[in-house]
């Protein structure tokens, strides 16, 4: 509150100059910002590959052998991801070519533009027309267009150029001593960075102004958003995540929404300490469960509420909620096909499919992901805290879990990888609470608890 914008001074003496709106831990003091960065698996591979590439393991101790096996796991994952992304790129290129050819054939057939209904009524008399009908039916039913194709190609290209490139590192932009994980004061006040689309979409879900006739309504009314930038286009770094959490706590956050995640966390202890700091200071943390279609009881996903080893740790943060993504479709497609799940590590689900929210330049867009589900829960927590300020963060967490909407007889398709066989299961086995966030019922429970 005491900070003055753009005067080059740390008016409130919190260590961060001109942080009127928040702070950016992936920018430099000169105003430059990190946009793309590598994935964590790439960084680990780049660090260990020179050591183990031609290693003679004959005389390795048990400890050395364990480290080597960890490297081989990383190497296999790294190479799998590269091959997978190349295959995706080739598939998209093939689809793009088929779309272009199919549209040419059908435009010629109909003598101009054609509707979905006309396409379905078409009785193809030759293989070429039948091919075109099948392709364009698939395209229209899945809302695929040239813009989406271009976006996906661009994303995959950048994955290969930056994310999986072991020779790429933008860290010099930040100018910190990266090896010093205790370093706190670096970065700049540019919370928007090169691309604020993801953060703006997430923030809108939690707290966009309600009932003003513009765009959409956020879950909570009259909330203050504190943007803290720590996630690039790539994987976030543990040091930045830890500092972002500490910054939010020290500057008065009641809820920390974390719409990010990754599969490796080489400096997990640093993040653990920051999570414990938030926990001890009564700040509720809401984390997106991830978009890998995986069971996080069995597959690592960070950050996590478990301190120490992911599987062996026995102590957990009390003020943590992990959120999976539910959808709007009934029946077996009720869960987002991309969503992570786990009846021990995912606490609840929230809407995260086709969510309409804010993006920069006064625009709106539909996105999907557990990144969209988490702020639904964060917004719910903010609402409860605003209406019932006597409630503690622990009570708010308990209320949210106690009030979920359950579906005891719902059978769904368990989220799975594209190359895996679909299997049916009960929605109840996907999370701790067995349900989906329910704001109305949460207020009913809060009213009783508050009184």
Regions found by a protein language model. Name each.
Residues 1-237, 311, 315-319, 341-345, ...:
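Subtilisin-like serine protease catalytic core
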Residues 28, 167, 283, 305-386, ...:
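Extracellular S/T/G-rich loop segment that most often corresponds to the catalytic His/Ser-adjacent loop
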Residues 30-31, 212, 231-235, 261-265, ...:
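Solvent-exposed loop/turn segments at secondary-structure junctions
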Residues 191-203, 290-292, 364-377:
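Gly/Ser-rich catalytic serine loop of serine hydrolases
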Residues 193-196, 217-220, 235-257, 266-287, ...:
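Mature extracellular/periplasmic domains of secretome proteins
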Residues 207-211, 246-250, 254, 276-283, ...:
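Sec-exported extracytoplasmic/periplasmic mature domains
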Residues 229, 257-261, 288-289, 324, ...:
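A cross-family glycoside hydrolase active-site/sugar-binding cleft signature
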Residues 249-251, 255-258, 269, 316-322, ...:
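C-terminal subdomain of the subtilisin-like protease fold in secreted/lumenal serine endopeptidases
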